[in-house]
Amino acid sequence: MVVCGETMKLVSLGVMLIGTILSVSSEELVGVWLGLELNLYGFLVIMNPDGHYSPEPCVKYFVVQSTGSILMLVGFVSLMEQHVVSGLVMSTAXTVLKSGVFPLHSWVPSVIKNSSWLASGLMLTWQKVAPLVFLSMILPSKSLWVVIVSMAGIGAVGGLNQNSVRVMSAYSSFVHTSWMLLGLTWSSVVFVGYFAVYSLSVGLFFYGCSLMNKMSMGSQLSSAASGMGLLMLMGMPPFLGFLAKVLVFLMSGSPVIVACIMGSVISLKFYIDFFYSMVMKSLVDKNKVEVKAIWSLVICMNIMGGALILVSFI
């Protein structure tokens, strides 16, 4: 059963990969829709491959994505029939819903909260690629700026005082989505660079958190993985998350970059709260403090703080 489950995961990941590539590279609207559907069905298997998790997030995700698919299909048919206005409205609404961006974003935290670590990680990373790319193509620049500013604000404020790591990560993804959308407005290379760094950060963070739930695994590995991923998500120098933001900042000439920066600064609050409440506690094993690990962490934080000060002067 375990081998069968792992095989199903690999097959589903392959289907998701093919679907995303088809959707992004297709020049026809039908190809975009078909790619998104392949991606959806592949991901549904990942969400609950062996039936051990609650079916609620899987059902909710299916309903949301199916609604988006129907709206998108109706919009595409309307565009083919030369009903441009209604077609664009339906297509945009469906893409916004499937992307989980403002104003149809409220379903994301509730689905993430009860999903597995793997499903949550993929939902916050890979599942965003095709819808965001298509959204950047059909939305006018000013409308896209409204989405970017709204996502940065909602993610920063919504993540405050959250007790669930997954929910916190969902709101954090809203802030990072604003950065990715801003990068998409200028260059696909910038988007790919930021997305790669963000995906690596989420992968490390969720991997460390999943290890914390397994008593057979040591605390040092989980602390190192989650701590490294968290620092990258925070955008602290000299980690890659900081460099990715600098790349978008240098390439973007839009004033909405201010909203993205403010969203990232505010989101530091709940990142730091999690850092001290979980990562520092994981360094204590049966009331025995691992002094070397703590001192290494303190030294690392001081070095990064000094680097941040130097960067601010530069």
UniProtKB/Swiss-Prot annotation:
Matches recorded under InterPro entries: Complex_I_Subunit_2 (IPR050175), ND/Mrp_TM (IPR001750)
Broad class of where this protein is predominantly found: mitochondrion
Membrane-spanning residues: 13-35, 61-80, 85-107, 117-139, 144-166, 189-209, 224-244, 246-266, 294-314
Region forming the signal peptide: none
Keyword ATP-binding: no
A GO cellular component annotation in the UniProt record: mitochondrial inner membrane
Compartments in which it is found: Mitochondrion inner membrane
Homology family: Belongs to the complex I subunit 2 family.
Protein name: NADH-ubiquinone oxidoreductase chain 2
Organism of this sequence: Mytilus edulis (Blue mussel)
Gene: ND2
